[in-house]
Amino acid sequence: MTFAAPLEAKSIRFRARSFVAFTLTPEAPMVEWLQGLDHWIGNSPGYFAGRPVLLDLNVLKPAPSEIAALVAELGTRGIRIYAIELEGASLGPDLPPLLVGAKEATTEGLLPGRKGGQEGSGKPDGKAAEGRAPDHGTEGRADAGAAGKGKAGASKTDESGPQVSHYDSGTLMIKTPIRSGQAIMHAHGDVIVLGSVASGSEIVAAGSIHVYGTLRGRASAGALGNTAARIFCRRNEAELLSVDGWYITAEEMEGVSRGKPVQAFLDGDGLRVETLS
């Protein structure tokens, strides 16, 4: 006598998520671009550690062999490429997959792209390639991400994260200090920190960033293309300040705005850091 167990219908669950992606867009000449990248990494060690990065090659349009060499170069710098954007390309199995159908997002919704400017300290100066931070965009895919679609959220690097409050306006309020190693990524509006931000931590916000204590970590406002975003802090000891991807480092602020209450904002085609009275 045989016994047949009843079949159980099992469903496969698919969910769409939106998340903040970090995008690198290489430009020729590659030697100079890599030197600029090394300068960025030197000023912000560990910035790419553990983060998937999108490689946008629509400007460079390299051959597959050149892509492999570039991915290897980035790998030696601790940058892990999880997907490549290159219209009309066909890549082999030894390269990261092509990202198809994703759109860049801003606080106003999905857009095909956005514009950028140049950075500076006080006055706009320097080449764009030397002052451009990695782009931050939201890419829609059917897998896990840092911020879920719908309710405003923040991602942290450990379980014992800061106390946060969410508001319908999209503002994220953090009531406790942000410790070293923690990362707050808020793709729905402003971030307000009532305490201090430790060295080695990071805040990424679609809107403005307000720190009512000492800012010692990295702060990136306007991460989804909001050029009107600003960064405010009571005491500036930041490792890096960035608005809409244009940044200024600690060494560039030394002797000018370090240790003072400041605001950082885009002024024309440059990033300006001003002291507050």
Curated annotation (Swiss-Prot):
Keyword ATP-binding annotated: no
Locate the region Disordered: 107-168
Matching entries from Pfam families are given as:
MinC_C
Q: Where in the sequence does UniProt note compositional bias of the Basic and acidic residues kind?
A: 122-142
Gene3D superfamilies found in the cross-reference section = 2.160.20.70, 3.30.70.260
Which keywords does the record carry?
Cell cycle, Cell division, Septation
| UniProt-listed InterPro entries | CAP/MinC_C, MinC, MinC_C_sf, Septum_form_inhib_MinC_C
State whether keyword Cell membrane applies.
no
State what this protein does: Cell division inhibitor that blocks the formation of polar Z ring septums. Rapidly oscillates between the poles of the cell to destabilize FtsZ filaments that have formed before they mature into polar Z rings. Prevents FtsZ polymerization.
Which HAMAP family does the entry link to?
Answer: MinC
Question: By what name is this protein known?
Answer: Probable septum site-determining protein MinC
What does the organism's lineage look like at the top?
Bacteria, Pseudomonadati, Pseudomonadota, Alphaproteobacteria, Hyphomicrobiales
